C-alpha cells in the first residue's frame, strides 16, 4: 500500500484498519513491557492440556489454481484481475496449496503443529453459488481433511474468508441482500454433511466487521462499494447505510447456520460453531473524559457491533443511538435466533491503537460508520492528526492482547475464545529473512500475554499463528510475508523452506524449549520500538 498524506479524521479509520490487517508489527509501551516481563519463563506445559497451538491460511490466499477443476471466480478474482492490487498481482498462484497440500500437511506434522485453520472456497465447492456440488472441489477438501486426520492435526474450518462467489454478487449484490442467508446456509449444509464427521470446529465468517467497513464504506476491498466523501473510485454504493446492512445480514446468516448445525448435526458430530472478528486493543489518547468515552465507544463499534448480537441479541445502545434509522433493527424473532448463537468467538489480533474523541461537529453533513463512531485512531501518543497518516511501521503491544482477552471475559459472559490470527509481517519487503528473529520475538511476547490472560481467568482455547507459510496477502500481494515457512514465489515450483520461527515454534510445541519473555520484552524498552514493515 502506498504511503499517503492526509488529515487523520474519523473517516481515516477505514484506511488504518486496512493497514493493520496487512502489516501488523511489533511495538509496546514501557508500561506494557513491564507487565509482560512479569510473565518471565513459560513452556508448552504451562498452558492447559486442551489448549491448542496452530497456524492458518485461507483459501484464496493459499490454494491458487483459481481456474482449475471447475472453480468459478470469487469477488477477489474479479478485484485482482482488474489490476486493483498495488503491484497488479493476483491470487491465481497463491501458495500453490491446491497441488501441494500433502507436502504442506507433512510440513505441519514435522513442525509438530497441533491444529490447522483453513477456509473452504465457496466457489470451488459450489461453483454456481447454490445447487450442484463440484466433485473435484469435494475431492480436494476431503483429501486435505483426511491428510490432517492421518497426521493427528486438529482441524478448524472457516466457511467464508472474504471470497464471495462472483456469480451471486452479480445476481443480488451478495451480503447486501437477505437472500444471502439462505444460500450461505445451504452452502454450510453441504460442508457439515460432507466434512462434519472429521471436523468439529467451524467458524462461519472471518472478520465481518472488516468486510462491512473495508468493502462497503471505504470501498478498498471487493466488491468496492462506497460513496463520496467516504471512499474513492467506487462506481456504486452508499457508505452511510451499507456497512450496517452487510453486518446485519452477516449476523443473521451466521445464526441461521448455527441453528442448522444444532438442529441437524451437532448431536452426532459433536462440533462447535463460532464467528470471527478483527480486533485491536484501544487505549485512551489522554485522561480526558471525552477520550475515555471515545475509547469505549470504539470498542462498541468494532467489537460490540458483532459480539453483542451474538451474546445478547442486539446491537450496543451507543450504535443504535448514533446510527439511528441507518442501522437495521432485529425483530423479536431474529433477536431470539441470534442470541447465544456462537459456541465460541475467534479474534484476529495484531496490534493496539490510541483513541481520541472526534465528536466535535459530528452532526454536520452525511455520516458513515466512522463518523458515527466519532473517534480518531493514532498509532502512538506521539502521533499528530495531520501529515503522513499511513505509517510504514506499526505498533507491537502484547499487553493489548491480554487486555482484549480479559475484556472479552468480562463483557461476554466468559464465552470461549480462539486467537485465530496473530502474526508478524514485513510489509513492502520482497523477501523475508529465514533468520526471522523479529517474528520469534513477536510471537513469544503475544503467547506470553495469552498465558497471562489465561491465568487471569480468560477462557482462551487456542492460539493460531498467521500464517503457516507465506501466502498471497490481501492488498499486499506477495510482498508482505507472514509465514513460518518461506515460499519462493519466483520459482514456478513454489518450494517451501522453514524459517527460524518454524524451528522455534516446533521446539516449543514439543516441549524442548521454553520462552523467556524478559529477554524478548525488557522493561526499559520504549513505546517507539517498531519493526520494519
From Swiss-Prot:
Residues spanning the signal sequence: 1-24
Keyword terms: Disulfide bond, Glycoprotein, Glycosidase, Hydrolase, Signal
Binding positions (a beta-D-glucoside): 61, 161, 206-207, 350, 421, 466, 482
Protein name, UniProt field: Beta-glucosidase 22
Superkingdom of origin organism: Eukaryota
Keyword Magnesium in annotation: no
One Gene Ontology term from the biological process aspect of the record: carbohydrate metabolic process
Catalysed reaction, written as an equation: Hydrolysis of terminal, non-reducing beta-D-glucosyl residues with release of beta-D-glucose
Any matching Pfam family: Glyco_hydro_1
Family to which the UniProt record says this protein belongs: Belongs to the glycosyl hydrolase 1 family.
GO molecular function: beta-D-fucosidase activity; beta-galactosidase activity; beta-glucosidase activity
Glycan attachment points: 41, 233, 238, 435
Intrachain disulfide bonds: 226-234
UniProt key word Disulfide bond: yes
Amino acid at each position: 500500500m502506498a504511503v499517503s498524506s492526509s488529515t487523520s479524521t474519523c473517516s481515516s479509520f477505514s484506511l488504518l484498519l486496512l493497514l493493520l490487517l496487512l502489516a501488523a508489527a511489533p511495538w509496546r509501551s514501557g508500561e506494557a513491557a513491564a507487565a509482560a516481563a512479569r510473565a518471565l519463563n513459560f513452556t508448552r506445559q504451562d498452558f492447559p492440556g486442551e489448549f491448542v497451538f496452530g497456524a492458518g491460511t485461507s483459501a484464496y490466499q493459499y490454494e491458487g489454481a483459481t481456474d482449475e477443476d471447475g472453480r468459478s471466480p470469487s469477488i477477489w478474482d474479479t478485484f485482482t484481475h482488474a489490476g486493483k492490487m498495488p503491484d497488479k498481482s493476483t491470487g491465481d498462484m497463491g501458495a500453490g496449496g491446491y497441488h501441494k497440500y500433502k507436502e504442506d500437511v507433512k510440513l505441519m506434522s514435522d513442525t509438530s503443529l497441533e491444529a490447522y485453520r483453513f477456509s473452504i472456497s465457496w466457489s470451488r465447492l459450489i461453483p454456481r453459488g447454490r445447487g450442484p456440488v463440484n466433485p473435484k472441489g469435494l475431492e480436494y477438501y476431503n483429501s486435505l481433511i483426511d491428510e490432517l486426520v492421518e497426521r493427528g492435526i486438529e482441524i478448524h474450518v472457516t466457511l467464508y474468508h472474504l471470497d464471495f462467489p462472483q456469480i451471486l454478487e452479480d445476481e443480488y449484490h451478495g451480503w447486501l441482500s437477505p437472500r444471502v442467508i439462505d444460500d450461505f446456509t445451504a452452502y454450510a449444509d453441504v460442508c457439515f454433511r460432507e466434512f462434519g464427521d472429521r471436523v468439529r470446529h467451524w467458524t462461519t465468517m472471518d472478520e465481518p466487521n472488516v468486510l462491512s467497513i473495508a468493502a462497503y464504506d471505504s470501498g478498498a476491498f471487493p466488491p468496492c462499494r462506497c460513496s463520496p466523501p467516504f471512499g474513492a473510485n467506487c462506481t456504486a454504493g452508499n457508505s452511510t447505510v451499507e456497512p450496517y446492512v452487510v453486518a446485519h445480514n452477516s449476523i443473521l446468516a451466521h445464526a441461521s447456520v448455527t441453528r442448522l448445525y444444532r438442529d441437524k448435526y451437532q448431536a452426532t458430530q459433536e462440533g462447535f460453531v463460532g464467528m470471527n472478528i478483527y480486533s485491536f486493543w484501544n487505549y485512551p489518547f489522554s485522561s480526558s473524559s471525552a477520550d475515555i468515552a471515545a475509547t469505549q465507544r470504539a470498542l462498541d463499534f468494532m467489537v460490540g457491533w458483532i459480539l453483542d448480537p451474538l451474546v445478547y441479541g442486539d446491537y450496543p445502545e451507543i450504535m443504535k443511538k448514533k446510527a439511528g434509522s441507518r442501522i437495521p433493527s432485529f425483530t423479536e424473532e431474529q433477536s431470539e435466533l441470534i442470541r447465544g448463537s456462537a459456541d465460541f468467538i475467534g479474534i484476529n489480533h495484531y496490534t493496539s491503537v490510541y483513541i481520541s474523541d472526534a465528536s466535535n461537529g459530528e452532526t454536520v453533513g452525511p455520516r458513515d460508520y466512522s463518523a458515527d463512531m466519532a473517534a480518531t485512531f493514532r498509532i502512538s501518543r506521539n502521533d499528530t492528526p495531520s501529515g503522513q497518516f499511513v505509517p510504514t511501521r506499526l505498533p507491537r503491544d502484547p499487553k493489548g492482547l491480554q487486555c482484549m482477552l480479559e475484556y472479552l471475559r468480562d463483557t461476554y459472559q466468559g464465552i470461549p475464545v480462539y486467537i485465530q490470527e496473530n502474526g508478524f509481517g514485513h510489509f513492502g519487503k520482497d523477501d523475508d529473512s529465514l533468520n526471522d528473529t523479529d517474528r520469534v520475538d513477536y510471537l513469544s511476547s503475544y503467547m506470553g500475554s495469552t498465558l497471562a490472560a489465561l491465568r487471569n481467568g480468560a477462557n482462551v482455547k487456542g492460539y493460531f499463528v498467521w500464517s503457516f507459510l507465506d501466502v498471497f496477502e490481501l492488498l499486499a500481494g506477495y510482498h508482505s510475508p507472514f509465514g513460518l515457512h518461506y515460499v519462493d514465489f519466483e520459482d514456478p515450483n513454489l518450494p517451501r523452506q522453514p524459517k527460524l520461527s518454524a524451528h522455534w515454534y516446533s521446539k516449543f510445541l514439543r516441549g524442548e524449549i521454553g520462552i523467556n519473555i524478559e529477554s524478548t520484552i525488557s522493561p526499559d524498552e520504549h513505546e517507539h520500538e517498531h519493526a520494519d514493515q
